[in-house]
């Protein structure tokens, strides 16, 4: 099978919905009857491709169509200042994308901010959701065990304000449990992605100044989610603590939790092979 590349799968769509008028970038991989939409996190320089490049081909090879959406304010998508709930904003954009692609129902796989977006979408358009996979995100709220904002979120916000290679390395050094995969090439690629869109960095900082609670607490509404849900967490997550994952499975009745030991905030990257097998089994049974 020909390797799937970012360039060959790169596409754009115009989303117009009320006050929204945004050019959104996405990658469209495979031609399966069922579609999995992957949603990235909020780190500077993030993108769907950067977040999930270790997870695309196994799903495509198993017969799924895989869509990687770059949320507004990241990668090649238009920038925006979010003064309200970014979770709801991203969900509206996702709704626009799946409407444009004429997809009646999708499975959603969301990491960190992507998990928040997946929950927001599921609460508003439950009839459009097949199954959910949430990793390192899905609801806000205060941890009873970890002072908030967490160590990782402090470094992330600091990197947005001062996008230097030194601050990037500080953040990414606690992003994962095992730092041996963090090469200088990876650091440089991420830095280049950040600095290529300084408007994204500035607008994220402006968004926090306008509304510090970009990702609201959905805890009181989790019981409304009926979709079968797989929650995946790293025991050593220093961005969003494990007890948040426990809150998700406590609130979503049709859910299960898998915890990776020796794993930080990026389970789909740190434990890719096991993660891919687990997600495929969940989606196909």
Swiss-Prot record:
Q: What is its EC number?
A: 3.7.1.14
Q: Which keywords appear in this protein's UniProt record, sorted alphabetically?
A: Aromatic hydrocarbons catabolism, Hydrolase, Plasmid
**What is any Pfam family matched here?**
Abhydrolase_1
Reactions catalysed, as given in the entry: (2Z,4E)-2-hydroxy-6-oxonona-2,4-dienedioate + H2O = (2Z)-2-hydroxypenta-2,4-dienoate + succinate + H(+); (2Z,4E,7E)-2-hydroxy-6-oxonona-2,4,7-trienedioate + H2O = (2Z)-2-hydroxypenta-2,4-dienoate + fumarate + H(+)
Site note Catalytic role in ketonization of the dienol substrate (substrate destabilization) applies to 190
Task: Give yes or no: UniProt keyword Cell membrane.
Answer: no
Q: Listed GO cellular component terms?
A: cytoplasm
Q: Quote the catalytic residue positions.
A: 265
Q: Which Gene3D superfamilies match?
A: alpha/beta hydrolase (3.40.50.1820)
InterPro entries associated with the record:
AB_hydrolase_1 (IPR000073), AB_hydrolase_fold (IPR029058), MhpC_alpha/beta_hydrolase (IPR023791)
Pathway assignment: Aromatic compound metabolism; 3-phenylpropanoate degradation
- Per the similarity annotation, which family is this? Belongs to the AB hydrolase superfamily. MhpC family.
Record's HAMAP family?
MhpC
**How does this polypeptide assemble, per the annotation?**
Homodimer.
Its recorded name reads: 2-hydroxy-6-oxononadienedioate/2-hydroxy-6-oxononatrienedioate hydrolase 1
Q: Which gene does this sequence derive from? A: mhpC1
């Amino acid at each position: 099978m020909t390797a799937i590349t970012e360039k060959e799968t790169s596409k754009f769509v115009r989303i117009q919905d009320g006050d929204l008028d945004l050019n959104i970038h996405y990658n469209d991989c495979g031609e399966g009857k069922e579609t999995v939409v992957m949603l990235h996190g909020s780190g500077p320089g993030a993108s769907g491709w950067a977040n999930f490049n270790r997870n695309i081909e196994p799903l495509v090879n198993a017969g799924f169509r895989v869509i990687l959406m770059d949320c507004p304010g990241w990668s090649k998508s238009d920038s925006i200042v979010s003064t309200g709930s970014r979770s709801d904003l991203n969900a509206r954009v996702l709704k626009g994308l799946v409407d444009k692609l004429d997809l009646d129902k999708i499975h959603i796989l969301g990491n960190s901010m992507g998990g928040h977006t997946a929950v927001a979408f599921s609460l508003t358009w439950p009839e459009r959701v097949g199954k959910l996979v949430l990793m390192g995100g899905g609801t806000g709220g205060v941890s009873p065990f970890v002072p908030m904002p967490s160590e990782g979120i402090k470094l992330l916000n600091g990197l947005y304000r001062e996008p230097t290679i030194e601050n990037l390395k500080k953040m990414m050094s606690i992003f994962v449990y095992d730092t041996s995969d963090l090469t200088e090439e990876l650091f440089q690629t991420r830095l280049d992605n950040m600095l290529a869109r300084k408007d994204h960095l500035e607008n994220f900082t402006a968004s926090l100044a306008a509304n510090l609670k970009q990702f609201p607490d959905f805890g009181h509404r989790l019981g409304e989610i009926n979709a079968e849900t797989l929650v995946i967490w790293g025991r050593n997550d220093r961005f969003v603590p494990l007890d948040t994952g426990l809150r998700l499975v406590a609130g979503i009745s049709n859910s299960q939790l898998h915890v990776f030991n020796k794993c930080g905030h990026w389970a789909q990257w740190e434990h890719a092979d096991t993660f891919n097998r687990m997600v495929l089994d969940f989606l196909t049974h």
